């Protein structure tokens, strides 16, 4: 059913089953543990050798992102009510919440005691330097930060944290890797899953990817993250076609109204929904 159900759903009536009239895409396995096939059939023809995919070098150079400092994640604030992205367990839709933000030295800050984390989206394809900033509730993160380049649909960098310096470390490590998923705490990268192919795919064997996946999930839990499948949720925070409140590199988006909205709900506070990064080096091509 794992192969038949999606084939039926997408109307691919010739795929998904081993039966007369179906395309013979078949793996013959010696057991259900190792999953190393003895025979591979593609459209009925035996495959003697699985060809190695040659990835063009330009596909591995998609992080057109300047270095940022913690200043790039500062949110000027005078107090008042703010829009907050609210996570819903088991859903990729988000709620549009209203809450008071913590205030330090004229800047809005994360408040892990109230499960309020900062979220940032950094444009990474064109080198524009745009950063959209906001706040999110529901991950449960108590320290550090985590982020990824797997972020539907634009696949910009998205990072969540309660420590601006840790957020900077996550972004810098993602830039060095050429994309992926990174978890950091204080001044240390705790776990990472490199995705160097367009920042979306791994070029490593499945076993290595599985080990790295377990590592990033364990590291996220060590930061206090309680939301189930946090990296899957992270990948949908910037999906600007799914209700209700999302974050993009241009700022917060009210999907229901289909318009960018400021973080603040108070008219007397002037705050841009997004602003350029603070560059300290040339664009990384």
What are these regions (language model features)?
Residues 2-285:
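Active-site microenvironment of metallo-dependent hydrolases
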């Amino acid at each position: 059913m794992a192969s038949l159900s999606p084939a039926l759903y997408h109307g691919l009536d010739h795929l998904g089953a081993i039966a007369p009239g179906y395309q013979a895409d078949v793996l013959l396995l010696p057991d259900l543990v190792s999953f190393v096939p003895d025979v591979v059939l593609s459209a009925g023809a035996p495959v003697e050798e699985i060809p190695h995919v040659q990835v063009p070098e330009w596909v591995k150079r998609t992080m057109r992102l300047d270095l940022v400092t913690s200043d790039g994640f500062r949110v000027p604030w005078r107090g008042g009510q703010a829009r907050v992205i609210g996570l819903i367990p088991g859903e990729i839709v988000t709620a549009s919440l209203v809450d008071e933000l913590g205030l330090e030295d004229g800047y809005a800050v994360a408040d892990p005691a109230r499960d309020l984390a900062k979220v940032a989206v950094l444009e990474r394809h064109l080198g524009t330097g745009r950063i959209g900033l906001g706040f999110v509730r529901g991950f449960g993160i108590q320290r550090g930060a985590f982020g990824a380049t797997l972020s539907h649909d634009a696949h910009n960098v998205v990072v969540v944290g309660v420590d601006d310096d840790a957020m900077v470390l996550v972004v810098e490590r993602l830039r060095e890797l050429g994309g992926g998923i990174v978890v950091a705490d204080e001044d240390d990268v705790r776990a990472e899953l490199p995705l160097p192919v367009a920042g979306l795919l791994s070029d490593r064997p499945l076993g290595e990817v599985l080990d790295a996946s377990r590592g990033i999930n364990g590291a996220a839990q060590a930061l206090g993250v309680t939301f189930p499948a946090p990296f899957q949720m992270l990948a949908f925070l910037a999906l600007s076609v799914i209700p209700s409140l999302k974050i993009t590199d241009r700022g917060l988006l009210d999907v229901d109204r289909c318009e960018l909205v400021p973080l603040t709900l108070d008219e007397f506070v002037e705050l841009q929904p997004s602003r350029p990064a603070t560059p300290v080096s040339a664009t990384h091509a």
